[in-house]
Each structure stands twice: as C-alpha cells, then as structure tokens.
Amino acid sequence: MNSKQDRIYAKPAQTISDFQFDSRVAGVFNDMIRRSVPGYNQIIATLGDFARRYVTPNSKVFDLGSSLGSATLSIRRQIEGRQCQIIAIDNSQSMIERCEENLAAYVSDTQVTLVCDDIRNVDINNASMVVLNFTLQFLPPEDRDTLIKRIYDGMLPGGILVLSEKVKFDDACIQTLLDEQHLDFKRANGYSELEISQKRSALENVMRTDTLVQHQQRITDSGFSHFSVWFQCFNFASMVAIK
C-alpha cells in the first residue's frame, strides 16, 4: 500500500481550512497516519487477530470509516473460507477509490463491498464484527450515542466492536504529559513545528475527543456486556466491546 510523503502542512498558509479527507489527504494518508498515530500498525495487525477469533461464517463485518482499507485488508486475510461479507464505508470518494485499488492488489474469496456514504446512514445487520478505527472522533458528539446503539442492535450475540480513538483526560497534568509525548512522537517522525501547528489548527474544529470513561459509559449504556481498553500509547487508545 504505497503512499507519498505527507507534506500538506509543510509550507506556511495565511488561512488554515478545516481538515478534510480529500484527494490530497488520500494521496498521503498511509504516511500521515503512521507518522501521526503511535501504535497504528499494531492496531491494524490486531484487528486481523480479533477477526480470526470472532467473525462467524455467513456473517458481515462493517469497517466504518475505512479510509485506504488497511483494516479491511487485515481482517480479510484472516477470514478466508467463511463466506462472509465485509462492508467498508467512507464518506470520501477519494478514499474509496484508493481503497478499491488497494483491495484489488490482493486475491481473496471474501466479498468486500465499498460504500461511499456517511456511516450514520448505513444499515448495520448480521454483524459479527464492527470496526470504528479513528472515526467516531470526527462525528458530532451528539450523534455518537445513537451510532453506537445502532451498532449494538445490528450485531450478532458474541460479536465484537473494535473502537480506536484519540482520547482526552480529565487530569490536566496527564493531559499535558501525553500531549507532549505525542508531539515528540511526531517530531521524531520528521514533522516540523510548522506542520504540527498548522495541522492542529486544521483539526481543532472537526475532531472532538472523548475520555475513556465517556467511551466506556456510551458502550455499556448501549447494551454491550464486556468492555476493555486493549491498547494505549500516549493519548491514543483502542477498545473492544463484546455483545
């Protein structure tokens, strides 16, 4: 899955537009997310492991906010021969087009249906696995409870939800510490202070994070029987919930 180097915010701009998953971002997304999100490769690999354990024959897998298809590919590799269907949804046509190219590079007997739509419009049913990989944080906060409840209602008993998010902390000291650790991570991956600052400005109106407590409360209120944070690095976490 090739990607150009992310240089979107490398030059000073007079005005910073809100971040969008447009063709510019789609072209560098693979590089961008691996240089920005600590543990991303581990999360993607483990999605495949979860799929191997939880995806049942003749069921569906929903990848909500599929971007370039990394999660879908990881899952698909582990569920060969189960007569399952993966539905990968993204509201960016540029992402869908590149995802289609990436999926075509690998032969599989597992059907993948790509859908360009808002994930809030998708009918979730017969699902043994649902993935929200750094997606929920871009939805309006008032829509998040409803989406998680719809996911729960559309899942099979014993199904798994994997939710990965950037998170915030009520403790100001911890928030500052982990923010600084994340900034150091980005610096170590070659991002300049200008790039870091301009991207932060682009994201501030479109990405609103929750605390881990908020995520757990939302998930348990929706009806899930089991919840755990299975991975955390700085202010990035991945959670599992089982119906």
Swiss-Prot record:
Molecular function in Gene Ontology: carboxyl- or carbamoyltransferase activity; S-adenosyl-L-methionine binding
Protein name per Swiss-Prot or TrEMBL: Carboxy-S-adenosyl-L-methionine synthase
The role this protein plays is:
Catalyzes the conversion of S-adenosyl-L-methionine (SAM) to carboxy-S-adenosyl-L-methionine (Cx-SAM).
Q: Does the keyword S-adenosyl-L-methionine apply?
A: yes
Q: What family is this protein classified in?
A: Belongs to the class I-like SAM-binding methyltransferase superfamily. Cx-SAM synthase family.
The annotated subunit structure for this chain is: Homodimer.
GO BP terms, alphabetized: tRNA wobble uridine modification
Q: Domain of life of the organism in this record?
A: Bacteria
Q: Which reaction does it catalyse?
A: prephenate + S-adenosyl-L-methionine = carboxy-S-adenosyl-L-methionine + 3-phenylpyruvate + H2O
SUPFAM superfamilies, sorted: S-adenosyl-L-methionine-dependent methyltransferases (SSF53335)
Q: What is its EC number?
A: 2.1.3.-
Binding positions (S-adenosyl-L-methionine): 40, 65-67, 90-91, 118-119, 133, 200
What HAMAP family does the annotation carry? Answer: Cx_SAM_synthase
Q: Which organism is it from?
A: Shewanella denitrificans (strain OS217 / ATCC BAA-1090 / DSM 15013)
- Is Nucleus given among the entry's keywords? no
